[in-house]
Every structure is written in structure tokens, then in C-alpha cells.
Amino acid sequence: MNCKILFRKELNDSECELSLLLVGDSDMKEINRLRRGKDKTTDVLSFPLEFDFSPLQKILPKNTSSDQKMFPPIALGEIVISIDTLQKQAKEIGHSEKDEFYRLLVHGFLHLLGYDHERGDKEEHIMKLKEDECLEILQGL
């Protein structure tokens, strides 16, 4: 994903990976109940590995080619997306399921990096700007 351009500071130009799980509403409701205590479905959940990125900026080499990397990719965590809710929201919003998938993926990815719109208006604004930037890049692909 070319969104890496937007996250160089957080990732220090390092390779990263994440797990993506696509489920139906019933499975999403169960995951949401077990992990967050909310007995309802939702569109996307993120489960970061609680990794502190700040030491990476000190130890990882910058701008090295992939064959020169000394470290394995950083495992960021897992994103879970409900396909049922994705389809409903795409129809309600009036855009394609592909666009809604990208929107949810980017939203989940930002949560893995520590962005959180629930921490207040300022954080919500910052996260929304990052989402919009990344979605512009994805729409250009």
C-alpha cells in the first residue's frame, strides 16, 4: 500500500505487516462483545500489538533497500472488517464496496498506529486528515 508515504515518521521507513480478517456481522458482534464488552456488531475493529514505535527511530536504519534490511517486518496487529456492515454502509453512503473497504482498512490501520478519534476533537480531526490523505492515494491507484 502506498500509504506508507504518509507514515514514515511512525514506521521509520521500516517494512510492516498486519493481519486482516473479514467476517460477517454475527462473528463481528461476538468479537466486539468478547474484546470490548459491546454486544453489537460494528464495521471495523483494530487490535494493535501495543508496540512502541519510538525506539525504532533510534535503532532501525533509514532508507535501506528491502534486501539490506536487518530486521523482519514489524507486526502491527490485526484488523477485523465486517463484510455485511461494509456492504450496508457502502449502499447507505452511495459509494462502491471497494471504496468502503479502503475506508475501513485505512481507519483500522490508523488505529494500529495509535491514532484514536475517541480521545477528543483534536485527535478526531488529526485522524480524519490522515484518513483523507491516504484515501486520496488509494483512489489514484
Swiss-Prot record:
First-listed, main subcellular location of the protein, grouped into a coarse class: cytoplasm
Q: What cofactors does the UniProt entry give for this protein?
A: Zn(2+)
- Name the residues that bind Zn(2+): H107, H111, H117
Question: What keywords would UniProt list here?
Answer: Cytoplasm, Endonuclease, Hydrolase, Metal-binding, Nuclease, Ribosome biogenesis, rRNA processing, Zinc
Which principal EC class is assigned to this enzyme?
Answer: hydrolase
What's one GO BP annotation on this UniProt entry?
rRNA processing
Tell me the compartments it is located in: Cytoplasm
Q: Name one GO cellular component term.
A: cytoplasm
EC annotation from Swiss-Prot or TrEMBL = 3.1.-.-
- MF-aspect GO terms: metalloendopeptidase activity; RNA endonuclease activity; zinc ion binding
- Cofactor binding, per record: Binds 1 zinc ion.
As for what it does, the entry says: Single strand-specific metallo-endoribonuclease involved in late-stage 70S ribosome quality control and in maturation of the 3' terminus of the 16S rRNA.
**Family under the similarity heading:** Belongs to the endoribonuclease YbeY family.
- For this entry, the protein name equals Endoribonuclease YbeY
Q: What lineage does UniProt assign to this protein's organism?
A: Bacteria, Pseudomonadati, Spirochaetota, Spirochaetia, Leptospirales
